Amino acid sequence: MALSRLMIRDFRNISVADLSLAADFNFLVGANGSGKTSVLEAIYTLGHGRAFRSLQSGRVIRHEQPEFVLHGRIEAGNVDARATSVGLSRNRLGDSTVRIDGSDGHKVAELAQLLPMQLITPEGFTLLNGGPKYRRAFMDWGCFHNEPAFFTAWSNLRRLLKQRNAALRQVSRYQQLRVWDQELIPLANRISEWRADYSAAIAADITATCAQFLPEFRLDFSFQRGWDKESDFGELLERQFERDRALTYTASGPHKADFRIRAEGVPVEDILSRGQLKLLMCALRLAQGEFLTHRNGRRCLYLIDDFASELDTGRRRLLAERLKATHAQVFVSAVSADQIRDIPDEKGKMFKVEQGKISLQSEV
């Protein structure tokens, strides 16, 4: 699975671009602020419905333009399969249109299913040293792509938690919350089971990849479901009613889950250098993408912003070798071509990005 064509209009500093892409490596080279990260962000937005550098859609629309428009052509990877066209537009009011094979009315979740991707950026350390929400997102990405019913259950869980938290400000007795909890409890248990199963299933892939990237450390991974593992969730909600009512939110549950990583028994953020943390982050993203391939035959797109950041030559070469071994489509940004010489790829393409204009510089 790969993007064979990408069209961008009025996204960030890019007025218009129409790119024919390589199925292997695509390199984006340009000075800081040139727009190379904007290309990565356009691809990410096409697959997620949102940008990774801003949660406000208006900020990614080019100055004085009413909307951005993104189009892509997805090749399935075999000769007999039909290509899929996808599109996303959004105006300054936040109204979106998702188009698949020429028809409107689709949901962003459908784009995410068609374009599984892994993002590695200089800000991606939050996966390791940020709050639990970043590691929940890591687990939920895997559940979303491996369990068809997950997204609906997850959406319903969010809705019920929001309603329950609003009700906590108004009720005086737990019995008044039962209408929400009767639906919430089975959803919470189901989502927790999916997360636990996924975390256990991917553990071997993560361990093997981390052993290549950080052989000097013994790493341990543990899933924490968000409430006491000895407690029944329904009983816990009733027991903690007064506490939740005082807080005006639900203090325990799958929305508090975490996926903890330790090195030699110590949280990785306390013992690893920034370069080692980046390698670990890359290992996690690669392991997750490869697990998807092993499980159902689908390949991710890998988006890597500022490839050389935090990595010496040896580590860049190791990352390049592992990326090539995935046989997936990879997009890499760098300030100069020197920073990506460790990624020789005879089938790749190199694009020069300058002030929002993108041109094919060479076939690698």
From Swiss-Prot:
PROSITE patterns: RECF_1 (PS00617), RECF_2 (PS00618). PANTHER family: DNA REPLICATION AND REPAIR PROTEIN RECF. It is found in: Cytoplasm. SUPFAM superfamilies: P-loop containing nucleoside triphosphate hydrolases. Keywords: ATP-binding, Cytoplasm, DNA damage, DNA repair, DNA replication, DNA-binding, Nucleotide-binding, SOS response. GO terms for cellular component: cytoplasm. Belongs to the RecF family. It comes from Sodalis glossinidius (strain morsitans). This is DNA replication and repair protein RecF. One of its GO terms (molecular function) is ATP binding. The gene is recF. The RecF protein is involved in DNA metabolism; it is required for DNA replication and normal SOS inducibility. RecF binds preferentially to single-stranded, linear DNA. It also seems to bind ATP. ATP binds at G30, A31, N32, G33, S34, G35, K36, T37.
